[in-house]
Amino acid sequence: MLKTERMDRVRAALRAQGLTQMIVCDPKSVWYLTGVAVEPYERLLALYLPTEGEPVLFLNRLFNVPEPPCRTVWHTDTDKPVAQIAEVVDAGRPLGIDKEWPAKFLIPLMETHPGMPVSYTHLRAH
């Protein structure tokens, strides 16, 4: 179940930092905000959280999540999930990135949208 109050607190903190969107990838933070608990290991798990609009969850089909709580973009190990994220983010606005997102995902996103402002954020999902 989507944790709307928790998301609203994170959105308020984003606005306070001048951000309008964020990629949350720490599995515990994703669980805290969505109720979806998976351990991705080396695979991509991400929650795109805009300050306005619907969040988008990016999940590998290997993860057993029968009823995701929000819009979900599924991928497999042979897909390019960063390209899927690149289609959702607003490249003209600063993007907050949580502290856990590996460079193997962040760098390709930045290469897809050169010049997109990216901010490492100290926000905690609480």
Residue ranges and their predicted role:
Residues 1-54:
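Terminal domain-start leader segments
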Residues 22-25, 97, 117-120:
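General beta-strand structural signal in soluble alpha/beta enzymes
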Residues 25-27, 59-61, 97-101:
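Structural motif
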Residues 59-73:
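Compact, glycine/acidic-enriched structural inserts
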Residues 68-69, 105-113:
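Short, aromatic/basic amphipathic alpha-helical patches
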Residues 71-81:
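Short acidic-hydrophobic, aromatic-tinged amphipathic segments that line or gate anion-handling sites
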Residues 84-88, 92-103:
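Hydrophobic alpha-helical hairpins/lids featuring a short glycine-rich hinge
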Residues 121-126:
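Conserved small/polar residues in nucleotide/adenosyl-binding loops
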